[in-house]
Amino acid sequence: MTEQKGRYLFTSESVTEGHPDKMADQISDAVLDAILALDPRARVACETLLTTGLVVVTGEITTHAYVDIPNLVRDVVRDIGYTRAKYGFDGSTCGVMTAIDPQSPDIAQGVDVAIEVRGEVNEKELEIGAGDQGMMFGFACDETPELMPLPISLAHRLARRLAQVRKNGTLPYLRPDGKTQVTIEYEDGRPKRIDTIVISAQHDPDTTQEQIRKDVIDYVILDVVDRNLIDDRTRYFINPTGRFVVGGPQGDTGLTGRKIIVDTYGGYARHGGGAFSGKDPTKVDRSGAYAARWVAKNIVAAGLARKCEVQVAYAIGVAHPVSILVTTFGTGKLPDERLAQLVRETFDLRPGAIIRDLDLRRPIYRQVAAYGHFGRPDLDLPWERTDKVDLLREKAGI
């Protein structure tokens, strides 16, 4: 597999924190954080549904901690910005229902101690088994300083800016829901220019589309985007339907785990299918994907490749990965097989070791439930560290 040649377009999207699916992710991760703050070894799989006037929180949670979930939900909804009935949703008056069960004992017996050491007392904390089967992907490339693909990086920055100008009063007529999309023109695998930007921003009913278009270009797009990437052929579609008043959970039902491509690489890399939010780190859907990003980013930061995708796969109840694959699309300084060997020598990808090395039993998850889990220079995220660069270069002999 090599880099694509010639000229082509690639598009990624993001959504604001007020999008109903992202509201669900933030609520699920807020519940997770609140529990981990009191019980770091809790087992949490928290799912959220939002619709007009109602939030439903369900899932499997095993913990000795008590968390007031209804009040927590209301705090999250109000913090996002749904504070008035005229927005179609109000955190102070919406209904909140909870339906929580404990984790299945059949799953727990495989996670508590992996099959490799079941019946033994040997490095027990490191030898917890994977919480499920599955494959996860991590990716990094040199298109941005944070080693992320440019389309998703810009889409996230635009979405965050859209929320910022709403919250700080720069554009007071904006409401919480919104989406962004960026199309980049590439040539021989390198980004050259922005072809198209799409922004849909929920707004008050008495604001004209002309005003919204002008303000979004001036205060959102031009504040975020490198003007060297814009030319006279760049197209802007601002609220292209002509009106976006009804939004949030009133406009669409929100569900945890419905924005997995927004959460990762914007479709630029492959995805194993597992969502992140609401899951404690024994769930390899989350910790495995974070570790794969950590590995891929260190390979690129070490100068061993310009693009790197890492696949890791697990069996439920088994600690060691069943497979590790490194793909560098023809940009690697070493063969992909050799890089995979370096990964096995340098990184311990057992779930317990990932949890230890990345210190994942902490309440750090709600902050990444909107605007991306990866490539966040605004946050100090352990899976974004490039702490294995020197060791990788030494082992690679460069």
From Swiss-Prot:
Cofactor note (record): Binds 2 divalent ions per subunit. Binds 1 potassium ion per subunit.
Residues the entry annotates as binding L-methionine: E60, Q103, D252, K283
Major enzyme class: transferase
Subcellular location(s) of the protein: Cytoplasm
GO MF term (any one): magnesium ion binding
Signal peptide positions on this chain: none
Residue sites binding ATP per the record: H19, D177, G178, K179, R243, F244, D252, R258, K259, A275, K279
Keyword Secreted: no
Keyword annotations from UniProtKB, A to Z: ATP-binding, Cytoplasm, Magnesium, Metal-binding, Nucleotide-binding, One-carbon metabolism, Potassium, Transferase
GO cellular component terms attached to this protein's record: cytoplasm
Keyword Cell cycle found: no
InterPro entries: ADOMET_SYNTHASE_CS, S-AdoMet_synt_C, S-AdoMet_synt_central, S-AdoMet_synt_N, S-AdoMet_synthetase, S-AdoMet_synthetase_sfam
SUPFAM superfamilies linked to this entry: S-adenosylmethionine synthetase
Region (Flexible loop): 103-113
One GO term (biological process): S-adenosylmethionine biosynthetic process
Catalyzed reaction equations: L-methionine + ATP + H2O = S-adenosyl-L-methionine + phosphate + diphosphate
Binding-site residues for K(+), renumbered to this chain: E47
Residues bound to Mg(2+): D21
Cofactors demanded by this protein: Mg(2+); K(+)
Pathway in which the depicted protein is active: Amino-acid biosynthesis; S-adenosyl-L-methionine biosynthesis; S-adenosyl-L-methionine from L-methionine: step 1/1
Subunit structure: Homotetramer; dimer of dimers.
Function per UniProt: Catalyzes the formation of S-adenosylmethionine (AdoMet) from methionine and ATP. The overall synthetic reaction is composed of two sequential steps, AdoMet formation and the subsequent tripolyphosphate hydrolysis which occurs prior to release of AdoMet from the enzyme.
Family: Belongs to the AdoMet synthase family.
Name of this chain's protein: S-adenosylmethionine synthase
Species annotation: Symbiobacterium thermophilum (strain DSM 24528 / JCM 14929 / IAM 14863 / T)
Gene that specifies this protein: metK
